[in-house]
Amino acid sequence: MSNTAFPAATIVGYPRVGRFRELKKAQEAFWKGKATLQELQDTAADVQRTYFERVTAAGLKADNYSIPATFSYYDQVLDVVRLFTLVPERLAEAKDARGLLDLPGYFALARGTETLPPLEMTKWFDTNYHYLVPEIGAGTEIKLNLEAIDEQLEVAKQAGVKVRPQIVGPLTLLLGAKAEQGSAEDFSPVDRLDEFVAAYAQVLEQLAERGVEWVQLDEPGLTVDRADNAKVAELAERTYGALAAGEKRPQILVTSPYGSLRENLPALLGTGIEALHLDLVHGVYSKAELESVSAAGVHLVAGVVNGRNVWRADVRAALKTLEALPGASEGAVSVSSSTSLQHVPHDLALEDPAEVPVDGLAFADQKVAEIALLARGLAEGEAAVEPELKAADEALARFAADPRKHNDEIRARAAAVTPEDFDRPTIDVRRAAQADLNLPKLPTTTIGSFPQTAEIRRHRAEARAGKISAEELNGFLRDEIASVIKLQEELGLDVLVHGEAERNDMVQYFAENFDGFATTRHGWVQSYGSRCTRPSILFGDVKRHGEGLRGEAFTVPWSSHAQSLSEKPVKGMLTGPVTILAWSFVRDDQPRRETANQVALALADEIADLEEAGIRIIQVDEPALRELLPLRRDEQPQYLDWSVNSFRLATSAVKDSTQIHTHLCYSEFNEIIDSINALNADVTSIEAARSHMELLADIPESFVSGLGPGVWDIHSPRVPSQEEIESLLKAAIGYGTIADLWVNPDCGLKTRDYEETKQSLRHLVDATKAIRASL
């Protein structure tokens, strides 16, 4: 084992899709058969080389392992599935002739094929990133395959960069996995920990043979409350004690992003690992805990630059924090991001200062520069970096004085909210008032969006470029809405949607119509696989655009047009306050509760205008409700209180005859089922197809809302058969009363194409008719 010192400045991850989404485009071309595997790999290498160039230009060094090998073709957890060939029996045909996962097989697990359903996907801790959930059984074979790591090492070698491989650690892997179908009821993937520790030890040995001197093992799973925290701490001590005992291995950095290690901190410190990363932004550590790191002789990698938000760091304050850390004066502290920078866009320099408040912002490349500056200040003293500190102070002062940040009328309105503003009559009263909707048993509907075709994107791009007028764009969009309504009528759906052709993104669309937001041109962030979003920047007080405190309606013209084309009810479609916050970069100068209530009141104004226009069913989507749930149980009640209340503030002023729907996806719901119930919606649709309706077992009899468990997994290109949907419906009926069930896809259809959509919806409607006939 080498004794190469850990670098003074580092990051624990970086955006992987490319500054201009080069990887996304190459992935999708490969999946469509328009690019070869070699062309995809060439693009991947280009993305990695650009990464090396950007971070070294920002201040990291190419020769000291400060740069992690952070690239992934799809997902970092799926990378470990490939590393160990963790293929469940039901997906065995994804393996190649060697019994390993090559890239096509890797993608098959992620996306499914005509014959293979994909792995389940869920949220990565409390972020907006999604990971593929490994399925591990008692007999799942472990077979090493370092091809992906070797590919990254070779690209780095050719670029003259010494990288440290970045691998999801064994505890996070197993704690985040699920038991393979057919496993014994009492089996858990963690039961096989010792076998996996041995497999990881083999990986470390092979990395040492390749000349690797540092490796990064990511253990965010140790910052989460578990059923038995003490037991997890014992497992952490056992795991890393065994890995550190290896005679032939790289030095080990363990990272702990997203929260606090708590009882896992002393467990790790006694194992013999060389370096430990602590998230000092989202985690809370006492002076004694920080002193214990230094006392154990473990190098502290201090995550002081926020890896999850886009605000410029107060580098002067951060430097003082670093200087006060035990061991800092002896060189036992390095400067890092709090988390991987995969959660923020690539480069603020790509944005127009007239459109975004650049004085207050830092994207990935700027955060790397902040880290390098702090490391220099820590090593050389504050005076050595005073010019840079002064420039940062001045930028933050300009941002604080920005008049767009504060509106006294908005603040007064939010402060005047009373408890009555959060309440609606009982569900029985509302159902009686909504009976004249005359919906059948098992009403069929979709979640909201329809495919965003190339033609739609072309028209929007031409309007932005001034090639067509706003009137021409609106005329095209009205025709597109008419086409979507006609298709739904032909398919026989019961409750229709207008398809959201006018929206580029379910949060950005609202940001573009609300005061207090800025939107970016190139601020892309990976959500999963090739799916990227452009989170908006919420930096000021919020209301709808337009004169007065209420502003002007912006969804009403589209919904009214759609409703005029059908006798069936057409849903008004809004994104809820929690999701708008979760999928934006949110101001950090006031409590989230206050910001959420401002957004909720703006949405309440829009809902009132939809009602006035005759829209009887209004859906307020909250797919991110679970996402923001704190990782530690003692911090969760406060969040659930304000998040539920913000939804109720947005929706509680409606008439009893107006049916409020909500939609949740990408989540493990069992922990918050009571809070979902407390939303007090009339109908709740949830993602359920990939989990085969398993989550319905957690829904109590006291659940008051109608329920639409998804019967079609829209995150995969495969078309479910009618029989498959019937099977899921029968399973759903087994969990609840037929009168309360709705039939719908898992999520919106924006990312699907029309051929898949038509076939799948036809099967959905036919399956529903067959089930109705059998009742």
What residue ranges belong to the model's regions?
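Domain-level signal for soluble alpha/beta catalytic cores
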Residues: 1-775
